[in-house]
Regions:
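Hydrophobic h-region of N-terminal signal peptides that target proteins for export
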Residues: 28-36
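N-terminal mature ectodomain segment of secretory-pathway/periplasmic proteins
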Residues: 39-118
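Surface-exposed, polar helix/loop patches in the mature regions of secreted/periplasmic/lumenal proteins
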Residues: 102-152
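Gly/Pro-enriched, hydrophobic low-complexity segments
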Residues: 121-125, 132, 145, 165-264
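Bacterial N-terminal signal peptides that target proteins for export
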Residues: 8-25
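A short, amphipathic edge element
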Residues: 42, 71-73, 145-157, 212-215
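Short, conserved active-site entrance elements at the starts or edges of catalytic domains
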Residues: 137-175
Length: 269
């Protein structure tokens, strides 16, 4: 009996040792696989792009512009977008002096039309106008209607992970592609790990990648239709010391929007 017991414990000891070795090897394999699946800069930016560019969206928002002198101007507008932001229609509803004014952006803001209710005329802007300020804000037309720009116009490189306002973030550098006409030489983006919301984006000068020209902040993140949505978006100019804040009043995703809305005729409605 004693010999059998000793043999049993010896066998058990060997099996226990083997079990430990197997567990250790499994853990090593898991770590290796995890490292092999580490997200690249392109992976992160694709997730960001998929998050912010839904198929269709409606928004009502208030835009407050603070000029260099500290003066403030406020507009309220509605916007409709389709095809992942490639088509965007914006219509101002307040104050009275701009009520009815509308902006149509197609082909990722490469084609822009504006409607002025006082004259009843529709005017097509020159192609380079997409780089200009929209309604004298700190947002350009291409900022507001450029769809898949993070993927189409930039290459991505993952930098060292960082924190922003206590949140763990991926940090990614986006560098302008040689054939792109986007207004920025590069972007630095802080992306929350938990939901891939880009909470901070730095924009650098088109001709000098060392000159920071403005920063975008996304705050008050709420879940709407399963999508993390920033209800407060702030663009601050580092050159002019001005800022523009967009506060969402209402937002709806994946709604039915007719293609007829994105036509010159619809601007006058």
């Amino acid at each position: 009996m004693r010999e059998n017991a000793k043999s049993f414990y010896k066998i058990l000891s060997k099996e226990a040792k083997m079990s430990c070795v197997k567990v250790f090897l499994t853990m090593c394999l898991f770590v290796a696989v995890a490292l092999g699946q580490e997200l690249t800069g392109d992976d992160i930016v694709k997730k960001v792009n998929d998050l912010i560019n839904v198929e269709t969206a409606y928004m009502k928002a208030k835009m407050t512009i603070t000029t260099t002198s500290g003066a403030k101007r406020t507009f309220t507008y509605e916007s409709w977008s389709k095809d992942r932001g490639a088509k965007t229609l914006m219509r101002y509803i307040a104050p009275p002096r701009v009520k009815g004014q509308a902006i149509l952006m197609l082909n990722n803001a490469n084609d822009i039309w504006m409607y002025f209710p006082r004259t009843g005329r529709v005017r097509k802007l020159a192609t380079h106008a997409k780089k200009q300020k929209m309604m004298d804000s700190d947002f350009s037309y291409e900022d507001m209607g450029s769809g898949d720009t993070f993927i189409d116009d930039f290459t991505a490189k993952r930098l060292k992970d960082d924190k922003y306002e206590g949140e763990k973030c991926y940090k990614v550098e986006l560098t302008k592609k040689p054939d792109s006409d986007i207004s920025y030489s590069r972007l630095i983006m802080w992306v929350r790990k938990k939901d891939f919301v880009p909470v901070l984006i730095e924009y650098y000068d088109e001709n000098n990648p060392e000159i920071l020209i403005k920063r975008l902040y996304q705050k008050d993140i709420r879940i709407i239709d399963g999508i993390p949505t920033a209800f407060k978006i702030i663009m601050k100019s580092e050159i002019e010391n001005s800022s523009t804040e967009i506060e969402l009043i209402d937002v709806k995703y994946d709604i039915q929007i007719s293609d007829d809305m994105f036509t010159e005729r619809s601007l006058k409605k």
